[in-house]
């Protein structure tokens, strides 16, 4: 027998919330939004954030997915006070290791009359509905609630093994105050007695999730809207757990809004935007993504979208979460991320560019001091222009390649105007005679040679130089880039393009 200590009742102790994902697939932004809101509620109230894993589905669970969940939480800085890797008074925190606990609770529920054996097959249930003229969608009909010993013996003689169902009170309406949605009511008969244990003895999610919440003293169950319909069954089980002394009270429930994609459809795992790591790979920083995920159902004020995670924690109240579906707007997410990039200290921003430049092959695994010095000079040129760190290779790659290897992008060369050759000739003449090579020196000399000397409008004057130096139509500021490249590289690139015209 497992010794189970009753936890404190909700409202009589500090807040205890949990994040309990199943390790199936890559982390979904909706899942991580749920983790964020639970974490923020715990941090705001001075409560406890518990992290456990619901890994009882051997056919779908994977260690790879488990590792990805840990990676996601670690990257975002969503730390937990109790659970996986941290420990605590309710170990273990993986459901697959808690079978003795569930078996003991099942035994106690059976002894108290809250569970009963159910032998009915799906086909038999459907046949009874059809014979009675009832809709088949009603599901289980309660046939096994009061079987006689003779009926049970007959079923067992046929070799049948029963499932175990929770005996719901007859004629009972279930209502509760959802901390997000307000008063919600489920009428009696709108849901059947749920199966809690399979015929082979394996406990189902419908049992283990509420049991863990009860034993771990969870005071607030904050979860996705898709689980709202299961709440009355869970409340009924929690009441049974109170009756047998496993729990002291039913936790409070709050159901967070769906995260939708284009067309207001629920964001599917098949949608790229649903994959948390897709956004990290594109160059979202944790501050920007956390800020945007917070906006999927909550806001710090009506006139302010950009805030730090510390400001979120200080202001977060789960009662302020909006129940309406929240659309994942990629453009808005990128704008939020851009704002956070601009808020980074220069050295922090520079450091975050390095992995993206390395992944693209722009920088080696061990950049040289010269490369790091060049990056330090160039990073401020793009910090105000960048929305995603993944743009770094395209914006800065030209600074880290040999002069002859600069890729002249087709759209850039195609946009060159007829006077491009004259512009390059005049620029080369002016620059070759230049003694200084500062941004100010370069701008003064080139404006005098091209804008004043050739009469080319400033709008078009420097496009050939930009293409020659960077290979692109759009780049970091030209004169600053040429200063960083230095005299020899800049002149070599101008001559290279001129030779093609």
UniProtKB/Swiss-Prot annotation:
Entries under InterPro entries matching the protein: aa-tRNA-synth_I_cd-bd, aa-tRNA-synth_I_codon-bd_sub2, aa_tRNA-synth_I_cd-bd_sf, Glu-tRNA-ligase_bac/mito, Glu-tRNA-synth_I_codon-bd_sub1, Glu/Gln-tRNA-synth, Glu/Gln-tRNA-synth_Ib_cat-dom, GluQ/Sye
Family: Belongs to the class-I aminoacyl-tRNA synthetase family. Glutamate--tRNA ligase type 1 subfamily.
Keywords: Aminoacyl-tRNA synthetase, ATP-binding, Cytoplasm, Ligase, Nucleotide-binding, Protein biosynthesis
UniProt: ATP binding residues: 269
Pfam families found in the cross-reference section: Anticodon_2, tRNA-synt_1c
Main location class: cytoplasm
Motif 'KMSKS' region: positions: 266-270
Function: Catalyzes the attachment of glutamate to tRNA(Glu) in a two-step reaction: glutamate is first activated by ATP to form Glu-AMP and then transferred to the acceptor end of tRNA(Glu).
Gene3D superfamilies with a match to the protein in the record: 1.10.10.350, Glutamate-tRNA synthetase, class I, anticodon-binding domain 1 (1.10.8.70), HUPs (3.40.50.620)
Subcellular location: Cytoplasm
Catalytic activity, as annotated: tRNA(Glu) + L-glutamate + ATP = L-glutamyl-tRNA(Glu) + AMP + diphosphate
Quaternary assembly: Monomer.
The UniProt record lists the keyword S-adenosyl-L-methionine: no
Protein name: Glutamate--tRNA ligase
Source organism of the structure: Kineococcus radiotolerans (strain ATCC BAA-149 / DSM 14245 / SRS30216)
GO MF terms, alphabetically ordered: ATP binding; glutamate-tRNA ligase activity; tRNA binding; zinc ion binding
An example Gene Ontology CC term for this record: cytosol
EC main group: ligase
């Amino acid at each position: 027998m497992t010794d189970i200590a009753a936890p404190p009742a909700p409202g009589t102790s500090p807040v205890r919330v949990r994040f309990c994902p199943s390790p199936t697939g890559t982390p979904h932004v909706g899942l991580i939004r749920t983790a964020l809101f639970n974490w923020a509620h715990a941090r705001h109230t001075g409560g406890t954030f518990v992290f456990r894993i619901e890994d009882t589905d051997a056919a779908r669970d994977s260690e790879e997915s488990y590792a990805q969940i840990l990676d996601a939480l670690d990257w975002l800085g969503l730390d937990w006070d109790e659970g996986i890797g941290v420990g605590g008074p309710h170990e273990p925190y993986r459901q697959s290791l808690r079978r003795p606990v569930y078996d003991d609770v099942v035994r106690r529920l059976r002894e108290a009359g809250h569970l009963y054996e159910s032998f009915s097959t799906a086909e038999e249930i459907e046949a009874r509905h059809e014979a009675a003229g009832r809709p088949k969608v009603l599901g289980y009909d309660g046939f096994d609630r009061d079987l006689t010993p003779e009926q049970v013996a007959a079923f067992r003689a046929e070799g049948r093994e029963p499932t175990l169902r929770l005996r719901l009170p007859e004629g009972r309406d279930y209502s509760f105050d959802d901390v997000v949605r307000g008063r919600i009511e489920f009428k009696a008969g709108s849901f059947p007695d749920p199966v809690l244990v399979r015929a082979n003895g394996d406990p189902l999610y419908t049992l283990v999730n509420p049991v863990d919440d009860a034993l771990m003293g969870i005071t607030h169950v904050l979860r996705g809207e898709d689980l709202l319909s299961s709440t009355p069954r869970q409340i009924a089980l929690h009441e049974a757990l109170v009756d047998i002394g496993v729990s002291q009270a039913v936790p409070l429930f709050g159901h967070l809004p769906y995260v939708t994609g284009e067309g207001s459809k629920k964001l599917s795992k098949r949608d790229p935007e649903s994959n948390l790591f897709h956004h990290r790979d594109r160059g979202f920083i944790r501050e920007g993504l956390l800020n945007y995920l917070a906006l999927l159902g909550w806001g710090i004020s009506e006139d302010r979208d950009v805030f730090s995670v510390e400001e979120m924690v200080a202001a977060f109240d789960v009662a302020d979460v909006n129940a309406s579906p929240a659309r994942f707007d990629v453009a808005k997410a990128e704008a939020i991320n851009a704002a956070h990039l601009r808020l980074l200290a220069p050295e922090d921003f520079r450091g975050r560019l390095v992995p993206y430049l390395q992944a693209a092959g722009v920088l080696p695994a061990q950049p040289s001091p010269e490369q790091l010095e060049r990056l330090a000079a160039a990073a401020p040129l793009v910090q105000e222009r960048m929305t995603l760190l993944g743009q770094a290779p395209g914006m800065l790659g030209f600074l880290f390649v040999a002069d002859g290897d600069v890729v002249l992008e087709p759209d850039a060369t195609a946009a060159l105007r007829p006077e491009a050759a004259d512009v390059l000739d005049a620029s080369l003449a002016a620059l070759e005679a230049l003694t200084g090579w500062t941004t100010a020196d370069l701008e003064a000399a080139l404006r005098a040679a091209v804008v004043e000397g050739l009469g080319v409008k400033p709008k078009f004057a420097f496009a050939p130089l930009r293409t020659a130096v960077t290979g692109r139509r759009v780049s970091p500021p030209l004169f600053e880039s040429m200063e960083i490249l230095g005299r020899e590289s800049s002149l070599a690139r101008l001559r290279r393009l001129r030779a093609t015209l």
